[in-house]
Amino acid sequence: MHEKTIAELSAALTKGECSSVELTEHFLKRIEALDGGLNSFVTVTAEQALAQAKAADDRRARGEAGPLTGVPMAQKDIFCTDGVRTTCGSKMLDNFIAPYDATVVERFKAEGCPMLGKTNMDEFAMGSSNETSFHGPVKNPWDTARVPGGSSGGSAAAVAARLTPSATGTDTGGSIRQPAALCGITGLKPTYGRVSRWGMIAFASSLDQGGPMAATAEDCALLANVMSGFDPRDSTSIERPAEDFTARLNEPLKGLRIGLPREFFGEGLDAGVAKAVDEAIEQYKQLGAEVKEVGLPNSGLSVPAYYVVAPAECSSNLARFDGVRYGYRCENPKDLMDLYTRSRGEGFGAEVKRRIMVGTYALSAGYFDAYYLKAQKIRRLIADDFARAFEEVDVILGPTSPSTAFRLGEKTDDPVTMYLSDIYTIAVNLAGLPGMSIPAGFSDGLPVGLQLIGNYFDEARLLGVAHQYQSVTDWHRRIPKGFE
């Protein structure tokens, strides 16, 4: 059952080949048997999942099932879940039980998808390797001595190991696409404003975007249909008519114009990754696409600009965790200042503190113009680069990450090297564009991800371009050894 895609599981439920209860039990057994070596789940909600599965079966019997009713899934532990612990990977929220559901969680509940549990993640979504989590690092199912990527590393590892058919992720600078690449699955970061951020714990509000992670592009399209849509409770949510993201899956690629940014194929790109991406480009040519070089001259500034904008927003967003109303509180504070200082000092991990410090500095009176304002100007230039490129091409293609999964502990002492693992993904967030990563082969036995970037609200086309590639390759069908 776990080898099937969501589309196949949905068909099996419709034909009565299995029930949602059987499916949910199967995945819960896999989590129990196999997650010990991965640490991809923070919380497993077995009782709740089985109750939801039973309700889904009853709903199907009444003829009221939607496309995903009864197909189990997992939520990244950044989405608030009513009555279920929501930690955001931090000691600060280790005992926090959310009093409400995030919009994304509500939508999956309304569709009738049993929630298997909450997946591990980098603390407050800050990290590229899932090593900053208070719950310990997640391991990559392809090689447990290596990282799964981050911050949605738990979601990526769980989907890759087939412990869940799908999981939600969030992407602020690559946190869906980079772990999807390192774990050999498909992940979609929608256009900024497509998916409601209500109830999604904020890191950098102008960059954060939730999205689906699954084995295939078709699965991601089905999940995006559930996740996306206007939400009046999120002031950044975009009001647009509902769209069917599966509508263009079978569109032929003849005449599709693909742009290859020269900045994504230069120094720093691992040879094995470059080879796999080149082979994928050849495959696209065979499918009828036209390929040409494009320029994104300011994309090299994306990492420094991001590491001013994102920490600035995080320092503001994380000011709410002060030990007063909820979250971690230090013992026996002497006075209010001591309560603030010690609660935050003891509750936050090193990377989160680093970003709060950088962000507070960038926003301080003497430095605001030199750092924050300048970073926002660069952000505009990056968006303009993409706009010019999309006048010439329909889709931009390149590697998702400069290398395959690196070893646990290899980059933890060097933040800048760690930050550079998102060098190809960050520009997409700064511009607010949709992007996705799909499996495109292996280098030394480790998965390589291919990144596809689209114009605003062009997710349906992106998903179609990915699906056409997946219809002639089988990389998305590969399962790591020991998890078959």
UniProtKB/Swiss-Prot annotation:
Keyword Coiled coil: no
MF-aspect GO terms: ATP binding; glutaminyl-tRNA synthase (glutamine-hydrolyzing) activity
Active site: K76, S151, S175
GO BP terms in the entry: translation
EC main group: ligase
Enzyme Commission number: 6.3.5.7
Catalytic activity: L-glutamyl-tRNA(Gln) + L-glutamine + ATP + H2O = L-glutaminyl-tRNA(Gln) + L-glutamate + ADP + phosphate + H(+)
Keyword annotations from UniProtKB, A to Z: ATP-binding, Ligase, Nucleotide-binding, Protein biosynthesis
Pfam families: Amidase
GO cellular component: glutamyl-tRNA(Gln) amidotransferase complex
Claim: Transmembrane helix is one of the keywords in the record: no
Domain of life: Bacteria
Record-linked InterPro entries: Amidase, Amidase_CS, Amidase_dom, AS_sf, GatA
HAMAP family (alphabetical): GatA (MF_00120)
Family as reported in the entry's similarity comment: Belongs to the amidase family. GatA subfamily.
Quaternary structure and partners: Heterotrimer of A, B and C subunits.
Record function comment: Allows the formation of correctly charged Gln-tRNA(Gln) through the transamidation of misacylated Glu-tRNA(Gln) in organisms which lack glutaminyl-tRNA synthetase. The reaction takes place in the presence of glutamine and ATP through an activated gamma-phospho-Glu-tRNA(Gln).
PANTHER family linked to this entry: GLUTAMYL-TRNA(GLN) AMIDOTRANSFERASE SUBUNIT A, TRANSAMIDASE
Protein name, UniProt field: Glutamyl-tRNA(Gln) amidotransferase subunit A
